[in-house]
Amino acid sequence: MTREDVYWGAKLACLEMIKSGTTTFFDMYQRPRVTADVTEEMGLRGIIAGVCFDGFDKEEAEKCKRHNERLIQDVDNYSKRVRFSIGPHAIYTVSGELLKWAHRFAMEHQIPIHLHLAETEGEVKDSLDRFGLTPVRYLYKLGVLSPRLIIAHGIYIDDDELRMLAD
């Protein structure tokens, strides 16, 4: 997507949020600086994640790391209403190594982690096939469950996994 595509999409999203009474949001998308600029323009508060997709490729993981290291330094260019976080997309697009790095990065910079998890039955089945574990149990095994982790969706999570997340 172009910078202009993201700009107008973010502008529309902010306008809809304002119309509905939303004052603060947490977003993970391409071109996070553009979303941050729009957030400033529109007067909202936002936590904006630098999205990561490594596709289980080490070179892509390194690009993601560098991108997020630069992004987190940009926070001082914005008012206190705009904060950055890290957004490893999902367990089916991001390697375990990058998830562990994102966890360490978030702890070091005291920022949240935005992660899509347990969105579909297919994701749970694929996780069981690939890792031998459900998505939440896979994250537990990696050691990346923490209060910094914000899960988007979380539809297919059982009661034991809810307790794991709460702990």
Language-model-detected regions and their locations in the chain:
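Alpha-helical scaffold segments that flank or form the walls of functional sites
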Residues: 1-43, 66-78
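Metal-coordinating catalytic core of metallo-dependent amide/deamination hydrolases
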Residues: 36-155
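A conserved active-site cap/scaffold subdomain adjacent to cofactor or substrate pockets
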Residues: 157-160, 166-167
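Short acidic active-site motifs
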Residues: 34, 160-161
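Catalytic-core regions built around general acid/base machinery
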Residues: 105, 164-165
